[in-house]
Amino acid sequence: VEARANAKAELSDVFSGRGICCMVRRPMSNDDSLRACGNPRNPCNPRTSHNSPGRVLFASLVGTTIEFFDFYIYATAAVLVFPKLFFPAGDAASATLQSLATFALAFFARPVGSAVFGHFGDRVGRKATLVAALLTMGLSTVLIGALPTYDAIGFAAPLLLALCRFGQGLGLGGEWGGAVLLATENAPPGKQAWYGMFPQLGAPLGFICSTGIFLLLTELLTDTQFFVWGWRVPFLASALLVFVGLYVRLRLTETPAFQRAIENNERVRLPVLTVVTEYPGTLVLGTLAATATFVLFYLMTVFSLSWGTTALGYPRRTFLILQMIGVVFFGLTIPLSALMADRRGNRTVLIGATLAIIVFGFVLAPLFGSGNTWGVLCYLALGLALMGLTYGPLGTALAELFPTSVRYTGASLTFNLAGIVGASLAPYAATWLAGRYGLSAVGYYVVGAGSVTAAALFALRQRESAPSQSADLRIS
């Protein structure tokens, strides 16, 4: 019955001239090709079936889980593997710092990915761009697993490693914003934060999977086997996860908000230029509002793993287990913060979590520096729980700052510029501060980052969308 009704409507469009007017009156433009002149199979056509909530949430979750899995296996390898295999020329401390420098490179690639993928996400559509971002990230990760080491090709090895890391950053720069929009632009009223937290859950899930596979490998393999070939397994195995993500995302249709943007001809020619020229204040404040989130997370993961297994003398396996326990608290507080955000507002929850992060900075050194297992576990659990409280509503809060026409670009840029400011140098800077001034200096680093973010959140007044987008995302 539905098929006959659609066919009848299409014939009516054709005979009335609406279905072919764009081809008769003028050549087909990019906008016309997206409208497809009433093609009922076009995902942008309003007569198409909508995505089911379960499919949307699973697609937004599975993609970010894969992307963060790929991202974190590099972070773990940058501490445990790459200093020995790709930077063996200097002492252990110098090799670790050089390895962490390649880790930081991806954060500078992420805004580039935001601009490139954001352009197509705001011009062509969310679905196709998400598929391209996933492929970029997946290919870069698999190539890392196939790289020869320094002993085989010399200085070319770290250069190729850095190039692949840059590719990872490009892919993740385009992934996060699209996944958040896929969820929030399909969300019913009053549940934007709840839907928006599903892509955020990809971070703890990806971390648990990446840490779990390294733990399994260290349990099954000898150190020699692990450093000869075992470390490559997580990178190569990510290809299977990418295929799963592609299968799920290729079955989606376009989001309702982007469909309306096409129908109302609201797309802009250069989204990144529009964001920079028309929303500069929003871009800067949004970036600073997300900075403490990045600083905290990469101190709790990359820096803590490095310092715990060197200065504190923890065995690699033991510390990875402690981190996995801490990440469980991260995963539990993400949905909790999303529920609170839908009731109290995103900004209120983010301000409360940021103030708690500032307090945490003062207890960082006593807890982590004690060396006591319970103290270290308390440090990891508390820090990562606070991370979940600030991370849960962050995606929705950043997406709400921009209208549909530039939302993919705007939200992605703010998030990934915050990655440069907050995360790119955080492990490097914390390692240097701890080595020279002690862990108290790292705690003050957290206090400073939290203070900047709190000031930005107080200054940032969430903006209502333009009237033409009043049915799209609502400010909590």
Give the positions of each predicted feature.
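Extracytoplasmic gate region of multi-pass secondary transporters
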Residues: 75, 281-329, 423
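Extracellular/periplasmic helix-loop-helix junction of adjacent transmembrane segments
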Residues: 79-110
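Helix-to-loop junctions at the C-terminal end of transmembrane segments
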Residues: 114-125, 334-345
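Cytoplasmic membrane-interface "Motif A"-like loop-to-helix N-cap segments
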Residues: 123-134, 343-354
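C-terminal ends and interior cores of transmembrane alpha-helices
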Residues: 135-153, 356-370
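Glycine-rich segments within core transmembrane alpha-helices of 12-TM secondary carriers
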Residues: 194-218, 415-426
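A membrane-interface helix-boundary motif in multi-pass transporters
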Residues: 219-236, 430-448
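Multi-pass alpha-helical transporter architecture, strongest
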Residues: 245-250, 449-476
